[in-house]
């Protein structure tokens, strides 16, 4: 029996209750008027600019005893792991080296053999209602996966965005390997746009989720709403111990649409965020901080907001997933169609961001550490934004420095 979070009739408030079986959330409004789509269209610009460091103050760096990575890095494609994926979104690595990938529009989870690329469908996640940028989004393995075989998933339902967990039984036939979903958290506002969707277990074994404001900008500053936030909960869905706001899953607020979460070697959290028309952001996350949206987009001179450590024009980035490797954050760009390297010194960039693969593989959705100096990179060319090429979508294995 778990504490469930559910939306009452007023959509932008949350309340806590206990139930054996939680009821469905009240229908969320699809607010899209006057808002741009984050997934963007065709890339713009010549790709020569990297980012802007002008305007506003940055957070003080945390540098004690840390080495600075080289100003310039490198990326080498080692191999194509898999092809022919449809609207891939979330990615999780199994202990044996195989990968699980979610399909946003088909609402399925597929296992990809890490050596041969063979694909085996686990099954369809019930209750997913794909539309616009919504559908089956992020996935993550339980920190106790070796014993509980739980897969967590963030998805858009008919009434909200929510997080569920399912037992994965690989002994069952293909297509029937997912158990019935247990709802961990419900009541995250949904929309045609700005659904967030990235989930990841942190070094503290708590579950973190990046959410969007669903096109209703006022939700980002409302600490009683789950929209436009980074959330931190226990594996059972309770507000995690030590959260900055009492009895609340909210970890940070003032976000527009968070789709990337990663921790560095010092267990510091970073998040990527879609801007509206001007600046996309990479942020160093501190519990309880306000990241400014909708009052600020990118760096701001106004007090009270935590400024991004880097920002990009939206045609260069439209960032989704991020990963940490070799002293740098690696950020996948959708509209920007490039992989960004941001070398770090503490919680600041130590050199100008560096772009790779500009336009070569199209839209890039997810990047995940693959051990040592390697990454997995997932493309996103079958999501209706561009014309897919033969073999799309694909998973690449990279060697980075």
Regions of interest found by a model, annotated:
Residues 363-366:
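Repeated scaffold domains used in trafficking and secretory/extracellular systems
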Residues 231, 280-305:
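Mobile, glycine-enriched helix-loop/loop "lid" segments at the mouths of ligand-binding/catalytic clefts
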Residues 221-266:
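Loop-centered beta-sheet repeat module
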Residues 5-23:
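Bacterial N-terminal signal peptides that target proteins for export
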Residues 2, 18, 22, 36-215, ...:
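Acidic, Gly/Ser/Thr-rich repeat motifs that build Ca2+-stabilized beta-propeller blades
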Residues 260, 269, 278-281, 306-324:
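C-terminal amphipathic alpha-helical segment
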Residues 252-274, 278-287:
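Acidic, glycine-rich loop-and-beta core segments that form the ion-binding/anion-interacting portion
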Residues 31-34:
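C-terminal motif of bacterial Sec signal peptides marking the signal peptidase cleavage site
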């Amino acid at each position: 029996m778990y504490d469930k979070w559910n939306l009452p009739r007023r959509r932008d408030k949350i309340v806590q209750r206990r139930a054996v079986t939680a009821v469905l959330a009240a229908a969320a409004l699809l607010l899209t008027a006057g808002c741009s789509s984050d997934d963007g269209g065709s890339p713009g610009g010549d790709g020569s600019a990297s980012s802007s460091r002008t305007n506003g103050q940055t957070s003080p760096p945390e540098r004690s005893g840390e080495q600075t990575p080289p100003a310039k890095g490198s990326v080498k494609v080692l191999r194509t792991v898999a092809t022919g994926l449809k609207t891939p979104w979330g990615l999780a690595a199994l202990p044996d080296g195989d990968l699980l990938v979610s399909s946003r529009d088909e609402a399925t989870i597929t296992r990809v053999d890490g050596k041969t690329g063979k694909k085996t469908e686990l099954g369809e996640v019930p209750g997913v209602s794909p539309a616009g940028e919504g559908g089956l989004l992020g996935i993550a393995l339980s920190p106790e996966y070796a014993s509980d075989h739980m897969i967590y998933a963030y998805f858009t339902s008919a009434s909200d965005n929510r997080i569920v967990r399912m037992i994965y039984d690989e002994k069952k036939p293909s297509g029937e390997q997912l158990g019935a979903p247990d709802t961990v958290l419900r009541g995250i506002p949904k929309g045609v746009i700005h659904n967030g969707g990235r989930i990841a277990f942190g070094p503290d074994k708590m579950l973190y989720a990046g959410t969007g404001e669903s096109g209703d900008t006022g939700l980002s500053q409302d600490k009683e709403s789950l929209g436009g936030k980074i959330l931190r909960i226990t594996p059972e869905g309770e507000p995690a111990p030590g959260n900055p706001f009492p009895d609340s899953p909210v970890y940070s607020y003032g976000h527009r649409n968070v789709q990337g979460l990663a921790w560095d070697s010092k267990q510091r959290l970073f998040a990527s965020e879609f801007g509206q028309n001007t600046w996309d952001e990479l942020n160093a996350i501190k519990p309880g901080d306000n990241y400014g949206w909708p009052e600020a987009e990118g760096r701001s001179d106004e007090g009270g907001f935590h400024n991004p450590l880097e920002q990009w024009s939206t045609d260069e980035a439209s960032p989704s997933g991020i990963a940490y490797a070799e002293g740098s954050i690696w950020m996948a760009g959708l509209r920007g169609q490039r992989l960004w390297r941001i070398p770090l010194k503490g919680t600041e960039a130590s050199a100008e961001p560096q772009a790779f693969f500009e336009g070569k593989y199209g839209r890039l959705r997810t990047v995940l550490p693959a051990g040592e100096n390697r990454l997995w990179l997932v493309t996103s060319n079958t999501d209706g934004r561009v014309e897919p090429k033969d073999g799309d979508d694909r998973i690449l294995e990279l060697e980075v420095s």
